Amino acid sequence: MLTNDWLESFLTHLYIGKNVSPLTLQAYRNDIMQFMEIELNHTADLEKINHLTMRRYLAWLKNKGYSRRSIARKMSATRSFLFFLQKKGCIKSGKWSAVARPKIEKKLPRFLYQHEVLALLEVPDSRTPLGLRDRTLLELIYATGMRVGELVNLNLNSLQLEERLMKVYGKGNKERIVPVGQVASALLEEYLSSVRPVLAAGNKDGRVYEALFLNRWGSPLGDRGVRYNFRKYIQQVSHKDGISPHSLRHSFATHLLEGGADLRVVQELMGHVSISTTQIYTHVTRERLSEVYHAAFPRN
């Protein structure tokens, strides 16, 4: 079997066996193709891949200026592929596994304070259809902590408005049920009754879409559209660097913990597989406590 065939077999294994999302599959494909393009010029025989091969590739990535996080991801994808080949009997040696992956410095998530979130939510002009749509989806991200990718994949049947619940499909297509706050529920009802029908009527291709959020042409609103509009709104209320729609998700978790929510509950709401992913928000709240203390205590 040719190397490209093995790659397709590996990606199929991830998609079917591991339930990996299409976006993650594409990242795996790109990273492994890059490794194959660079290293198979040196080592035409897969069996000859060893720790020197991996070190050479690691050095190449560093020289190209990739960040530690990108290098760690690329090395992880490549190692997973090689482990797959070893399991299939295509390669026997595991010497390549001796090369350590670069350690990633954990960065505290960027979030907005509560007054900043409230200011952001007031920016869209709710008197217009698109403004009310944007106010609704911003409120929904903050009220549920969902990712933008999860938001744009919501369908009409995702909603259980009477129970104020929503079905969300996260990473790996894993389903979770999240509660929806009173304000977000009221906005959703208004959007569904007075805005979505107007947007749907603007569709010219004759198709009927089940997507919850539609663009001005009546088609499903995409990830790029959400991010574009967010940048337009956030620039009016905050000049912090690196603030994105994902910052609303970070704000959701941070504000819950500041309000006394249990860490395990926040983990479930966020859809985190590991509690360690959720624990980073405890560092954020401690930093906030320290900031408030030093600003308010008279003997500082």
What are these regions (language model features)?
Residues 1-300:
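Conserved catalytic core of the tyrosine transesterase superfamily
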